Structures are given as C-alpha cells and as structure tokens.
C-alpha cells in the first residue's frame, strides 16, 4: 500500500514510516544472534564458537546489502514523489538489474575468498570446519538477502515501511523454528543453522515479491519500462555505493574485534 509522504501531519507520517524501518534494521541483525544462541544451547561451546567467529563477517556483508539497496531506493522515492511513474518504474527495473549484478559479484567474491577470510580472522583449527561450512552457506545466501533488501527498499520508497517489517518479523520467528528443525531433527549441525537463516531470508524476499506482483500496480513493469538506461544506472550507483560503503567502514571495527577475541581465546 503506497502512502504519500507530502500530505498529512508530517510528524505522524515520519513516525509511522521510521519506526518499522528502525525495528526492521535491528531484526536483520538477529539472524546470527539466534543461530548462535540455539547452536550454543544444543551443540555446545565449540559449535557456538564456530558461529560466533564469523558473526562480524556476516554483519559486514549484511550491512553492505542493506546500504546499497537503501541507496537504490532513493531515486525511486524521488520520482514517486514527483509523480513521474514511468520514470520510477524504469528506475525500479534498472535497480533490479544492478542488484542482481551485485548478487553475482558479491557472492562469487565471498565464496572464492572464504578460506582467506577465515585465515584473516585467525579461526582455530578445531572449529575451522564448522565455521567454514556455516559462513560458506551464509555467503551462498547473499542473493536472498539482496532480494529482500531491494524489494523492501522500493516498498519504502512509495511510503510502505510496514509491509517489509511484517515479513521480516515473520522471517525472524521462522528462523527460530527452522534452526530447531535443521539442528535437532535433521542433525545438520552448524550448517543447518546457516540453511535455516538463508531459507528465512528467501521467504521474506518472496513475500515482498508476491505483495508487489499482486497489489502494487504502480510498480508493475511494462515492456517500455524494461530497458537499461545509462543515466538511471549512474544515478542509482551514485546513491547505492556511498550508502553501502560507510556501513562497511563501521562493521570493519567489529571484524577487527572478532579477530582479537579469537586470538585471545586460544589456549
């Protein structure tokens, strides 16, 4: 449901829009925390260490995904507010293509560099295998994270921050049950926790896609909307990259902290 942000009580509109957005950003951080809590309780200290050793990397990648997709939503919001719906739809298409490209590049780079990342973190040998399996599966789920974050970004661009939050809250709860199912019932260990996480992320993204395809007619792309434009791609990248990289800068301190903790925890 689109909402005009230029009509009505400004304070009320901002609060209604901002609160789900803030809570949603917090919820996205809970995937790894939930995994760690359940893994620690069921599988023990070494399994917990395997998940915890990679948490900063997971937050780093997630932060970049959130940032770049939020940036892609800014030009979409601009043209929605200007009531230039044709231009807005073309930007949605261009943003989708760029997001797909980012998914391929980021996933490939993270998977290829997975071993090197764990070596940089100084992950001990006794937890290395489980840590590798966990973070590799998380990396393979990057496209699902980008799917949710891009679709939620364009929903927020037309004033709807509530729908993405509802789906994210559902996915966070679902992640708990999937963790228990994959770890307790299927006996998949740390890998099961990662599979549960990316499955929950995928479902939240698919739910957003269903809402857009069924109810958000103003976002339905026609034949004339589905073409790449250099100007659109440049504007999207000029917004997306600067919002993605500052997030990386903030998360790097956590990465350094994780490395120090792992080193300090060695016997």
List the predicted regions and their residue ranges.
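Short alpha-helical transmembrane segments in multi-pass integral membrane proteins
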Residues: 1-18, 76-141, 185-238
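Hydrophobic/aromatic residues in alpha-helical transmembrane segments
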Residues: 19, 35, 72, 113-114, ...
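Transmembrane helix-bundle signature of multi-pass secondary active exporters and lipid flippases
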Residues: 21-74, 138-145, 234-242
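Hydrophobic/aromatic residues within transmembrane alpha-helices of membrane transport systems
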Residues: 23, 35-39, 51, 76-81, ...
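Small-residue-rich hydrophobic transmembrane alpha-helices
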Residues: 48-108, 145-164
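Hydrophobic transmembrane alpha-helices of multi-pass small-molecule transporters
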Residues: 60-63, 175-180, 205-209
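Alpha-helical transmembrane segments of multi-pass membrane transporters/permeases
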Residues: 99, 154-177, 195-198
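The Walker A/P-loop phosphate-binding site
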Residues: 241-267
